[in-house]
Amino acid sequence: MSWRPVTVIKYWYVGGHRDNFPQVVTSKYPIENVRRIVGQAPDSIVSHGAGWARIVKNGRPVNIVTLHTWPQAYAFQAVDRDASKAEHGGDRYRRMEIEYICSHTIATQSDAGQQLWMMMGDFNSRSRRDNRVYNYPDDDTRLLVHDYIAEHTPYVDVIAEKHPGEFHTTTHGQSRIDFVYCTQPLCERITRAEVIADDFTEPVRDPGKLSNFYHPSDHRPILVDFDMK
């Protein structure tokens, strides 16, 4: 029997959240809370919150942004959900959320493109880089979130960059809605990046057929390794 060394997790961080869906960062290095993000009422609420944490590795700050955008087809707090859905309210709400999150994190740094930044989570949105699979119209609102990131930030889509021309679903269906983004200086340190698809991570529908409930999860994990020397 062989044994592998175990990394002891000494530090943890919970981002801003308004409900029971926070994001958590664990680390063997001390974590600084830079900002917990929940948005502003009445029209800029970040539904599940977001966080901006920072660690220092070998003397270099690493900025970590976590998020989980609004999941529904209608807008958050929509009074008439059917009408909101017909107007693509959910897509437009997620577009507002990502602009709010980016403007309060990476956009606060004029030289962010030369710094070490990552942003990750369940975006509940599809990317134009995968549109050869989806075949959506060019102006489809389902592409708004990642269009904003591509047009207004220095972030690089890690999975798309490391697996050009390939499609890797992150759900039980054929949807890539979970992403890891990095700025180029951090992207250059990546040694491995993949969506983990195996017998354990395969989403299996709950026997009780609970709505949208899968074991072990309705999302597949994304693994990204970095050489931070």
Which residues fall in each region the model found?
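A solvent-exposed, charged loop/short amphipathic helix patch at secondary-structure junctions
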Residues: 74-92
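Soluble or luminal CAZymes and related metallo-dependent hydrolases
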Residues: 45-48, 89-102, 140-141, 216
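Glycine-rich, phosphate-binding/catalytic loops in enzymes
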Residues: 2-7, 43, 81-83, 134-139, ...
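Structured beta-strand-rich core segments of catalytic domains in phosphoester-bond hydrolases
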Residues: 1-72
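Metal-dependent phosphoester-hydrolase catalytic domains
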Residues: 107-118, 124-229
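Short amphipathic alpha-helical segments and helix-helix/interface helices
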Residues: 2-4, 23, 98, 102-107, ...
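A short secondary-structure junction signal
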Residues: 65, 74-79, 129-132
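His/acidic metal-ligating clusters that form di-metal
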Residues: 56, 63, 90-123
